[in-house]
Amino acid sequence: MTVLGHPRSWSCHCLPVLILLLGIGHGPRVEGVTHYKPGDPVILYVNKVGPYHNPQETYHYYQLPVCCPEKIRHKSLSLGEVLDGDRMAESLYEIRFRENVEKRILCHMQLSSAQVEQLRQAIEELYYFEFVVDDLPIRGFVGYMEESGFLPHSHKIGLWTHLDFHLEFHGDRIIFANVSVRDVKPHSLDGLRSDELLGLTHTYSVRWSETSVEHRSDRRRADDGGFFPRTLEIHWLSIINSMVLVFLLVGFVAVILMRVLRNDLARYNLDEETSSGGSSDDFDQGDNGWKIIHTDVFRFPPCRGLLCAVLGVGAQFLALGTGIIVMALLGMFNVHRHGAINSAAILLYALTCCISGYVSSHFYRQIGGERWVWNIILTTSLFSVPFFLTWSVVNSVHWANGSTQALPVTTILLLLTVWLLVGFPLTVIGGIFGKNNASPFDAPCRTKNIAREIPPQPCAISVELYYIFATVWGREQYTLYGILFFVFAILLSVGACISIALTYFQLSGEDYRWWWRSVLSVGSTGLFIFLYSVFYYARRSNMSGAVQTVEFFGYSLLTGYVFFLMLGTISFFSSLKFIRYIYVNLKMD
């Protein structure tokens, strides 16, 4: 009790510190906390710009030659906002609550040919900008490009020098914000000589209107003003197809496989009764199928420490994914709360480290593992080390290109502190509890000292094609978290059913090496997810450039690895439960 008392007390004091470190207090904002009086100033923050087709390639708005105050004042950001690439700063726009502005000059500029070329390149790459008004994002394109494929060929590039802001209010709160360039002619950037300066006058207007919508939760109006496409709607046909697939698989396992098992059990138990005069070994030599390997099926696998680490981290990500979806269902994530899902993911990852330590150490001790300290180190490194290596490469590329996605040094130190002071200690604490609470592995059958020779196995491949490619790399705003939770449950159910079926076929072939194969069979879905991401990049997206490419493939590989851990864990424990069931019901001497 003395050993466990100190970590438990330490963790209780550390949890509030973790919440403060992550900025939960000022990360997710409570809707409607800002109340205005007529004439009160409304601050407009400029945030970031970037290519429309490269969602993760963003730069600070003031990196472009635009109207900029003499002294840039940055807004204090939460951890989630920093991770999301936000770098908000005050602007020259003067907006007052419920006061319309017909046309006001923002600034006068004289651009050199190099600055004009920078704007031309940004417009050709379809750069968009993002402003923030009262925690509402406002997005629009930097300029306008017109290209004709007919003869004579034309290529015109123009810069939007006038922005029309439209804001809706209800009572003393801002409900909706948008920007448009309708009825505005872009300023041409063509035909400028290398030694010539381009004079520009940036202007803006503000229109206020009252709305009957009382809350920003009406996402049909408040999400993003329709700037990003909203193509992710409920595809009922896909949902029905998934349901039919699940019902077929469950029916296969529950009806067909159970009927086969009953026949096998009846035959094996009848043979056992009729052969009572001979020894068990003589009886085994005259039989075949999964019964004959009952003395080897619970033989512990090689690399048991690595197997337990995979199961522990997989269980952690199952809890993490479920927690994120449940929090989304509770309405904790929406477009107004910048980076809330990032902060929540870090918080949940740190807190669920105890799950990985407990599951890994508990099962490791059950199957006879003695080096539990090494098992804990392996468990805590199984995901964190690949993640750190991937992040280092991606962050270095962002830093070299001046992207806002590159994390500041202070944020890096904060995340490292969270892992060292919370994640790793909770893994150790969970490991201690798991080790101390572990009971001996209760195998229904005894295991021989000499392993049985495995006959030649037939070769087959089973691929479960399940499509749930997240919209992280696109521009859609996905809000159907109820459907996502349902589909997540379908994915786990399908993985469990396939694992049980493949394990039965493997045991029927007298191959008792099911431990690792049960993890790899369904866990290989992670490889498919990565291969699909390659197909998506090449055929379904318009991404380009080193920054976006490195980020896409780096985190796609990491995503496939996480799915391997989660589905491999579900697959293993489903197979273990199934094997216990069939051998418990088998009569043996």
Curated annotation (Swiss-Prot):
Keyword Transmembrane: yes
Residues listed as glycosylation sites in the UniProt record: N178, N401, N542
Record field: transmembrane: 237-257, 310-330, 339-359, 373-393, 412-432, 482-502, 518-538, 552-572
GO CC terms in record: autophagosome membrane; cytoplasmic vesicle; lysosomal membrane; membrane
Example GO biological process: autophagy
Subcellular location: Lysosome membrane; Cytoplasmic vesicle, Autophagosome membrane
Signal sequence interval, chain numbering: 1-27
Membrane topology field: Multi-pass membrane protein
PANTHER family in UniProt: TRANSMEMBRANE 9 SUPERFAMILY MEMBER 1 (PTHR10766:SF177), TRANSMEMBRANE 9 SUPERFAMILY PROTEIN (PTHR10766)
Function: Plays an essential role in autophagy.
The protein's name: Transmembrane 9 superfamily member 1
Protein's organism: Rattus norvegicus
Name of the gene: Tm9sf1
